[in-house]
Amino acid sequence: MPKITKIEVQKKNKERFNLYLDEEFEMGIDMDTYVHFNLKKGQIVDAADMEKIQKYDQYRQAVNVAIQFLSYRKRTDHEVIQHLQKKEISESVIASVIDYCHEQRLIDHEDYANSLKNTMILTTDKGPGIFRQKLRDAGVEQTIIDVYAERYENEQPMEDIIKVANKILKQKKGPTVKRKEKLSQALMQKGYSFEIIKVVMDEMDFSQPEAELDGLLQQELEKVYNKYSRKFSGRKLINKTIEGLMRKGYKYDKIKAKLEESGIVDGTEEIE
């Protein structure tokens, strides 16, 4: 029966050993494998022993891959499994590795959710909705998602959300109704709930200088009028222009006044 004739430390990796049977190189083994089987020179090993050693070493190599992957940041089961699958590690070994990671608390979904919550609140302008999606994508259980999303919403300072809203609002020009609509949409895209958005909207100042609004209306009038003048003329052109500007949030009386001011219609002409 085969006998272990030499066990030597690998030159490039001091945590692994070369195992020789009957003076021939057999395989490399992990430090933990070496200790686990209490391997030593002169030990007799049969085929069944070698199969156990090989399987255990494959498992230990997979554990080390997982530990290396987890060393950069917190991960979930789903993320570790995907990483190990890319390394073409068998499903049975992966399952054992995940069990090991949980036993050693290397993977903890509650800790993961809590850490992500704190990081996102401190470093991003995103709301609970985006937080929920990130946890779902990472494979966190729904019960944990619900608990930590609620904590996220409770812990995120309202003044921070208002700052985000003000930053967005500065970039949105035009009628108040449209600015409100665009701000609401932008906040929803960032993951804020209807309830939070309603509170924020009540805190916002949507006022704009009248001269600025007047200038914007003039610009929009010229664009809309020129666009429809390619297809329409006369009363139809005027009505299409008014409809187009009202869809953009401008009020009828302001549009009518601007049409008259621009000389497109006179003050005596009725506009439908």
From Swiss-Prot:
GO cellular component terms given for this protein: cytoplasm
Major location category of this protein: cytoplasm
Example of a GO biological process term: regulation of DNA repair
Keywords: Cytoplasm
Domain of life of the source: Bacteria
Stored Pfam families: RecX_HTH1, RecX_HTH3
Protein localization: Cytoplasm
Function as written in the Swiss-Prot or TrEMBL entry: Modulates RecA activity.
HAMAP family documented for this protein: RecX
Family of this protein: Belongs to the RecX family.
NCBIfam families the record matches: PRK14135.1
Protein name: Regulatory protein RecX
Taxonomy of the source species: Bacteria, Bacillati, Bacillota, Bacilli, Bacillales
